[in-house]
């Protein structure tokens, strides 16, 4: 009988470190709920002591997620563990994940300590975490470059202190698969109490070996794999969870293990992470790339038509990618749109049907037929822009040509007031942005601009994702339309609303702090 491999997702903690702009609490919650729907066993959602924003994100997700265990990261520092526990206490089930470096290089140059002192601190902090929960994970940072005898000492001590999961990270993506398998096997041979904990692995992709190392570790006895959707993460990224999950499913004959993942949710979750994080998926990305199931060779096409198994080791449907897509028109009713959303697996709580249907009709009038990918894009944009808006794009027009200076006129609703400005720019998009800056006086600096086609052909929707700098902080914005300039304008307005909302939150926090201070003085 096969054993289960626990899937530990760190998209919202380690994965977020790769992003140019931090995710909002709402965006993190969207991803967390998608991960829960996909069936991840554990989700690491933040580092609460690092900032009030991270604390709020962890607390919000802990309150909402019911079917996955919510985890927070903490260094082997008392305050870290106490704050992590405080942020997680509202959760249905939670885990505290604490870590300390164990390699000679890290101990000597980073910690300026000794192995004995590291072990002593690990024991104390694991015990402290156990005061809050029975589920404590301990990580040996840079385990891949830690001598096996030293690593075994640390692991044995952490298990004796109460750690229920021991994580072995290849922190810098240095280890080869056969080496990593040897580390796991070596721990099973050397640590007498290893049967009292689950052995986990956390690999990085600096040499392109993250997935290979994780699978080698599973083959050697590891029973938890940590990673991020689409492999996002610091430097070259984390282990791609979708790749490990499908490798375990497809090669069960070799690995003899399974996961509790709902495979049909993989593609949808991957797309959501890509959209929210503003990180396009390469076409040749394994499992979820747009070309993952494409066949261009005539010989391959002929073979697939005769029997898909000739050249496909898994089907698009196995990850939730349905190739037959129903098209809707402006004559399709609200019920038809809802029915299609139901068929694609969306719950009513995940989108506003009235808003979605209004956006659908406008799009159908422009392009005639609306496909599944159009509906998904509209639902995503609608969810992103549900929060209160101070700015709204009322009108814009542009004039440009090969020998002309681009000019834009923009009307922007700012609260109850509508303001208008015109400006020149280096192309129509820049002209629109210059006009918007004149209206608001925010003077945001564009850091990143990307355009993604949602669909196929000349009528495809264009999704514009931008990152803008304002007062030392980075804000993300997204816009969607059949017209690229309109998408660009909407993305900038989304940025402005995010800036405005952040300022409102700051005002509210200051108001509460002042209120608390006044109460103290009264007492």
From Swiss-Prot:
Its cofactor is Mn(2+). It comes from the Bacteria. Pathway: Amino-acid biosynthesis; L-leucine biosynthesis; L-leucine from 3-methyl-2-oxobutanoate: step 1/4. Its EC number is 2.3.3.13. One of its GO terms (biological process) is L-leucine biosynthetic process. Residues 392-523 are annotated as: Regulatory domain. Its main location: cytoplasm. GO terms for molecular function: 2-isopropylmalate synthase activity; acetyl-CoA C-acetyltransferase activity; manganese ion binding. Mn(2+) binds at residues 14, 202, 204, 238. It is found in: Cytoplasm. It catalyses: 3-methyl-2-oxobutanoate + acetyl-CoA + H2O = (2S)-2-isopropylmalate + CoA + H(+). Keywords: Amino-acid biosynthesis, Branched-chain amino acid biosynthesis, Cytoplasm, Leucine biosynthesis, Manganese, Metal-binding, Transferase. CDD domains: DRE_TIM_IPMS. Gene3D superfamilies: 1.10.238.260, 3.30.160.270, Aldolase class I. InterPro entries: 2-IPM_HCS-like, 2-isopropylmalate_synth_dimer, AIPM/Hcit_synth_CS, Aldolase_TIM, LeuA/HCS_post-cat, LeuA_allosteric_dom_sf, LeuA_bact_synth, PYR_CT. Residues 5-267 form the Pyruvate carboxyltransferase domain. The keyword NAD does not apply. One of its GO terms (cellular component) is cytosol. Coiled coil: none annotated. It is an enzyme of class 2 (transferase). Catalyzes the condensation of the acetyl group of acetyl-CoA with 3-methyl-2-oxobutanoate (2-ketoisovalerate) to form 3-carboxy-3-hydroxy-4-methylpentanoate (2-isopropylmalate). Belongs to the alpha-IPM synthase/homocitrate synthase family. LeuA type 1 subfamily. NCBIfam families: leuA_bact, PRK00915.1-1, PRK00915.1-3. Homodimer. This is 2-isopropylmalate synthase. It comes from Escherichia coli O81 (strain ED1a). The lineage of its organism: Bacteria, Pseudomonadati, Pseudomonadota, Gammaproteobacteria, Enterobacterales. The gene is leuA.
């Amino acid at each position: 009988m096969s054993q289960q491999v626990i899937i530990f997702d760190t998209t919202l903690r380690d994965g977020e470190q790769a992003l140019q702009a931090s995710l909002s609490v709402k965006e993190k919650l969207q991803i967390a709920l998608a991960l829960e729907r996909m069936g991840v066993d554990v989700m690491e959602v933040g580092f609460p002591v690092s900032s009030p924003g991270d604390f709020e994100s962890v607390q919000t997700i802990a309150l909402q997620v019911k079917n996955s265990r919510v985890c927070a990261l903490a260094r082997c520092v008392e305050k870290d563990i106490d704050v992590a526990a405080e942020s997680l206490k509202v959760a249905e089930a939670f885990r505290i994940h604490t870590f300390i470096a164990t390699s000679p290089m890290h101990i000597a140059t980073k910690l300026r300590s000794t192995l004995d002192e590291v072990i002593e601190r690990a024991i104390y902090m694991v015990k402290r975490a156990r005061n809050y929960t029975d589920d404590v994970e301990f990580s040996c940072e840079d385990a891949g470059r830690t001598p096996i005898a030293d690593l075994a000492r640390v692991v044995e001590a952490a298990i004796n202190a109460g750690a229920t999961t021991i994580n072995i990270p290849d922190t810098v993506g240095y280890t080869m698969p056969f080496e990593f398998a040897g580390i796991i096997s070596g721990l099973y041979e050397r640590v007498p109490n290893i049967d009292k904990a689950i052995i986990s692995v956390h690999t990085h992709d600096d040499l392109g070996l993250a997935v290979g190392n994780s699978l080698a570790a599973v083959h050697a006895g590891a029973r938890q794999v940590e990673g991020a959707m689409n492999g996002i993460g610091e430097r070259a990224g984390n282990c791609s969870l979708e790749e490990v999950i499908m490798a375990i499913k497809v090669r069960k004959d070799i690995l003899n293990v399974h996961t509790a993942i709902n495979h049909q949710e993989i593609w949808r979750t991957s797309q959501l992470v890509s959209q929210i994080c503003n990180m396009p998926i390469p076409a040749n990305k394994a499992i979820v790339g747009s070309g993952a199931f494409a066949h261009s060779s005539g010989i391959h096409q002929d073979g697939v038509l005769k029997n898909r198994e000739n050249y496909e080791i898994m089907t698009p449907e196995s990850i939730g990618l349905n190739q037959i897509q129903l098209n809707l028109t402006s004559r399709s009713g609200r019920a038809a749109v809802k029915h299609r959303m139901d068929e694609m697996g969306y719950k009513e709580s995940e989108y506003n049907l009235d808003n979605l249907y209004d956006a659908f009709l406008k799009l159908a009038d422009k392009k005639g037929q609306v496909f599944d990918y159009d509906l998904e894009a509209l639902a995503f944009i609608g969810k992103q822009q549900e929060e209160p808006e101070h700015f709204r794009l009322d009108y814009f027009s542009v004039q440009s040509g090969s020998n002309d200076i681009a000019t834009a006129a923009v009307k922007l609703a700012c609260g109850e007031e509508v303001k208008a400005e015109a400006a020149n720019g280096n192309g129509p998009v820049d002209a629109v942005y210059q006009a918007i800056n004149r209206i608001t006086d925010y003077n945001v600096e564009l850091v990143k601009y990307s355009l993604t086609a949602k669909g196929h052909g000349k009528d495809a929707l264009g999704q514009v994702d931008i990152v803008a700098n304002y007062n030392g902080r980075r804000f993300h914005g997204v816009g969607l339309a059949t017209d690229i300039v309109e998408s660009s304008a909407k993305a900038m307005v989304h940025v402005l609303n995010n800036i405005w909302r952040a300022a409102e939150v700051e005002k509210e926090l200051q108001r509460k702090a002042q209120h608390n201070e006044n109460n103290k003085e009264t007492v």
